């Protein structure tokens, strides 16, 4: 009786894109229905990126409330909340209050309208996923040739790279892992003109503007950076 809602992020946007299973997400839906609890899904990073219907559509689950931002306007500052009609009608004078930092930002609204139109009328999301698959495949070949154990988590359009046989299944597992190889690798990538997040928790995000030339540049820098990281690790081992 004391629980109003369950908030879940089926793909962790700030931790390697660690993903919940469909069974878990659907169980969350059933439990919320059973106990009269609202199910809220955080789609701030996955919405309009992994699928037109967001991560919820991939799990075939409808939340009571969901949140969107980021890809919705392709980088312009915007955020949105949506949900079941019964829930959304509570946001009214005399009902639940709601304010927004980006409320009535006309430029962002125009950008979002155009962005959603493009997503609806073109294969942009399929292009993102295909690019991500190619990037993962190239990375895998480079790492396999050097015998470096690794795994990927998340969706092709938004994935994490993890240096272990299996990706972590929650934040605590990531926290206990040795992510120092990625940290070193990321800095070498930056030195080779590929800007990646230096924190291994942040996934790699695909962009529809990236073409095959960008892919080739990224993989060349990745291969060079892997070798530099291996050299750095060996130097540190000898010095210790």
Segments and roles (model prediction):
Residues 1-240:
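Conserved N-terminal phosphate-binding loop of PLP-dependent enzymes in the Aspartate aminotransferase
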